[in-house]
Every structure is written in structure tokens, then in C-alpha cells.
């Protein structure tokens, strides 16, 4: 796909019409910097504003029990609003009068992707806290070096291209007042990528559920139902990341029927969880032992049930290391990925502890090995625990507590 900006083609430019219209309210964003805001009101959002997931979800659940503050979830998903309210949580539809009022009067914006999941245009003058959504393996934001990537154009070029990207997607270039990280190493990457000066190593709120699986059980009924439906002897989770250049028609080199036969033989369920920005069809066949989870679903409560994680370049494995379970890496397109999509902070083989496969035959053989001797997949040139500690300073369920204290002490 030529002349693209993070996978955006001319045929899809119509979807940016709302962005162009939103520029008309730019003066409102500027004026809101002068408006007083309530420090007790903290508003939360996640991803693209449709889901209840990731770091924002777990910090919100923690903060909702704090009487010192008022915590509100803002979303474009009306069904989610109803669901959260049924659980006794405060939630509002993004474009409702109440949500707009909260967006312009609340002091604290907490998000794990961009301010737009709440409302970028009402965030002027707010205290912005970015929880982000992963310890990076691939380069992100200011550190992206692929020259046709929107972040590269918006950060490292001049002229019309830079102006266009920053005007159409201003939320991509917001510098948060605070950020959190999982280790000193990750903190350094975030400082470089986002330009945020106040970053605390608190750990990720979403990782609390890895250490304490029953935490917030009252609010995780949907996820618990998925866990209870996994009745096979073993469970494997396949969670690849997205591609900047091929989000819609990427072919995954997996022979699904052959894989399904192996899974059936070993009484194993194979879960597929694509990245929220991945629109490719991972599989088309209907297979008895393979299930595809919704892109926006929260997989962290499932980690307690998962016996093996398979990924390519997703940083999810840094979190999964906290389970002490094996990871299988399947970087089948690594050369193309490094040249066309993203470069990486470290050499891939230097931070990926576990076995690797580069084609389906190798992939199949690694799974056969896993079924015979599961822990063998943890054996590699890299020490599993060394990488685990390098990317996770804390190994407890207090990340939300530390994050809350960090935010409160900086207001």
C-alpha cells in the first residue's frame, strides 16, 4: 500500500471527515485551559472508547472504592454504560450532556491510549495521566523510524505533511502530565517516545489481576464465564500484534485444520485474540478446538487459565512472564516487519525468552514439544527470569494502589 499513513488509504479518507469537522471546535479546546476544574473528579477511558479494558479498567475499579474522589467511566458504547451502571459503577455515554459536562469540569483525565477515548477536544486544562498499554518491544510514537508512518511524519518532518497529521490527529501528539511504567528500562523508553518528564515505576494496574486472579471478581463475570467454558485439559492463547502496513488482508501461515487435529488429540483449546487495530481474518475455517475472542475483549483475567502464550511482536509477553508459564514466539514475517512496519528498541532475540518458530512446520513441532514437556519451551539462551525482572520491577498486586498514590500526590 503506497503513500499511506499508518495504513490509511485515500478510499478510507471519508472516515476522517469527523476529524476535519472537529477542528472547528479548536478554539473551545484553547479556552478550556482557562476554566477551573474539580480535582476530586477523575474520568477514565480506554482504547478507542468502546471497551472496558486494559490499565484504565483496573485503575478505575480500584479508584471507584475511594471516597476521596469521584471516578467516572466515559465511553462511546451505550451497552457498556448500562452494564457498568448495573454493577454500581459510574459511567456515561461520551456524547451525553452529563459526560460533556464532566469532560469540561473534571481535573483528571486517565487513559491508556489517547485522550480521544474520553474527549480530546474537552481536555484543554485537564491533568492528563497516560497509563499506556504495554511495555514496548517495537518502537512507538517519537521513536518510530519508518518514514511513511504518521508518527514519524508528525514528529520528524516539516511542512504540509507534519501540519496535516498534527491537525487531523492532535491526540496522537499530546504530552501527558504523568505516566507510569513497569521498570526503569521501560521508563527510559517512555521518556524518549512520549516526552513525559514525570514517569513513575508503579507497575501496570492490569497486572494486578495476574498476581491475584480473584481480584475484582464481582466485576469480571463475563470473563469468568469464558474461563468456565474452557473445559479442555490445556488452553493456549495466540495474541499477535497488528501491522501498520497490512491490517486488513494479512494471511497468517497456519494450517488450521491440521492444527485443530493436534489440539483435539491433546485435549486443548486454542484461543485467538487479535489486537484492537488488527482487522485481518486470522482464520476462516470453523474448527472445534479453536476460538476467536473479540478484539476489544479483556484477556488478562484469562491468564490464570492459559498454559502457553504464543505471540510475535506483541509486548503482552512481558506481562505474561509474571505467570511463570512458557511463551512461544512466532515471528514468521520478521524481516518485512522490521523494514516496513516498526523497528525495535532491542534486538528481538535479546529480549524474547523462549523457543521460536518461523514457519508452520516449525510452529507445529514446537507445539508437539509443548504437549510432551511444557517447561522445555522456557529454556533458551536467554534466562526467563532475567527478562521478567528487567521488564517488571514489581511482582505483586499493588500496582493500582501505587498508581493512585502517584497521581494524588502530584495534583
Range-by-range predicted roles:
Residues 153-154, 274, 288, 315-391:
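Catalytic binding pocket for nucleotide-activated donors in carbohydrate/polymer assembly enzymes
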Residues 53-67, 193, 199-284, 355-359, ...:
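Conserved catalytic-core segment of nucleotide-activated headgroup transferases in glycan assembly
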Residues 2-97:
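N-terminal pre-catalytic "stem/leader" segment of glycosyltransferase-like enzymes
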Residues 2-3, 9-13, 215, 268, ...:
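C-terminal amphipathic helix plus adjacent low-complexity
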Residues 8, 12-29, 141-245, 276, ...:
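A nucleotide-sugar donor-handling region in carbohydrate enzymes
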Residues 92-107, 276-318, 351:
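Donor nucleotide-activated moiety binding/catalytic core segment of transferases
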Residues 109-132, 136-139, 297-341:
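A donor-sugar binding/catalytic signature common to diverse glycosyltransferases
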Residues 57, 85-151:
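Extended catalytic core of nucleotide-activated donor transferases of GT-like folds
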Amino acid at each position: 500500500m503506497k503513500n499511506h499513513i499508518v495504513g490509511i488509504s485515500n478510499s478510507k479518507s471519508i472516515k476522517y471527515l469527523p476529524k476535519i469537522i472537529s477542528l472547528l471546535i479548536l478554539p473551545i479546546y484553547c479556552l478550556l485551559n482557562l476554566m477551573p476544574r474539580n480535582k476530586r473528579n477523575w474520568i477514565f477511558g480506554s482504547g478507542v472508547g468502546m471497551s472496558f479494558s486494559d490499565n484504565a479498567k483496573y485503575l478505575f475499579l480500584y479508584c471507584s472504592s475511594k471516597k476521596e474522589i469521584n471516578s467516572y467511566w466515559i465511553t462511546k458504547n451505550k451497552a457498556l454504560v448500562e452494564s457498568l451502571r448495573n454493577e454500581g459503577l459510574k459511567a456515561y455515554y461520551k456524547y451525553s450532556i452529563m459526560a460533556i459536562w464532566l469532560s469540561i469540569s473534571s481535573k483528571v483525565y486517565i487513559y491508556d491510549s489517547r485522550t480521544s477515548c474520553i474527549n480530546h477536544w474537552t481536555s484543554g486544562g485537564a491533568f492528563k495521566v497516560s497509563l499506556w498499554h504495554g511495555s514496548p518491544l517495537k518502537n512507538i510514537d517519537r521513536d518510530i523510524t519508518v518514514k511513511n508512518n504518521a508518527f514519524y511524519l508528525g514528529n520528524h518532518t516539516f511542512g504540509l505533511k507534519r501540519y496535516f497529521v498534527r491537525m487531523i490527529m492532535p491526540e496522537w501528539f499530546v504530552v501527558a502530565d504523568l505516566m507510569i511504567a513497569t521498570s526503569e528500562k521501560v521508563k527510559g523508553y517512555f521518556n524518549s517516545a512520549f516526552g513525559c518528564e514525570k514517569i513513575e515505576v508503579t507497575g501496570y494496574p492490569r497486572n494486578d489481576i495476574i498476581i491475584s486472579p480473584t481480584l475484582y471478581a464481582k466485576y469480571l463475570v463475563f470473563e469468568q464465564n469464558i474461563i468456565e467454558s474452557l473445559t479442555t485439559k490445556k488452553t493456549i492463547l495466540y495474541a499477535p500484534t497488528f501491522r501498520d502496513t497490512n491490517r486488513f488482508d494479512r494471511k497468517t501461515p497456519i494450517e488450521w485444520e491440521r492444527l485443530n487435529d493436534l489440539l483435539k488429540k491433546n485435549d486443548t483449546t486454542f484461543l485467538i485474540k487479535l489486537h484492537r487495530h488488527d482487522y485481518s481474518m486470522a482464520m476462516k475455517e470453523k474448527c472445534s478446538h479453536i476460538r476467536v475472542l473479540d478484539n476489544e475483549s479483556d484477556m488478562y483475567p484469562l491468564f490464570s487459565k492459559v498454559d502457553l502464550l504464543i505471540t510475535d511482536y506483541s509486548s503482552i509477553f512481558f506481562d505474561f512472564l509474571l505467570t511463570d508459564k512458557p511463551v512461544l514466539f512466532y515471528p514468521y514475517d520478521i524481516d518485512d516487519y522490521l523494514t516496513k512496519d516498526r523497528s525495535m528498541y532491542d534486538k528481538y532475540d535479546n529480549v524474547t525468552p523462549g523457543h521460536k518458530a518461523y514457519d508452520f512446520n516449525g510452529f507445529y513441532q514446537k507445539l508437539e514439544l509443548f504437549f510432551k514437556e511444557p517447561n522445555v519451551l522456557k529454556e533458551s539462551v536467554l534466562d526467563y527470569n532475567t527478562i521478567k525482572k528487567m521488564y517488571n520491577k514489581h511482582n505483586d498486586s499493588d500496582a493500582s494502589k501505587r498508581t493512585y498514590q502517584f497521581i494524588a500526590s502530584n495534583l
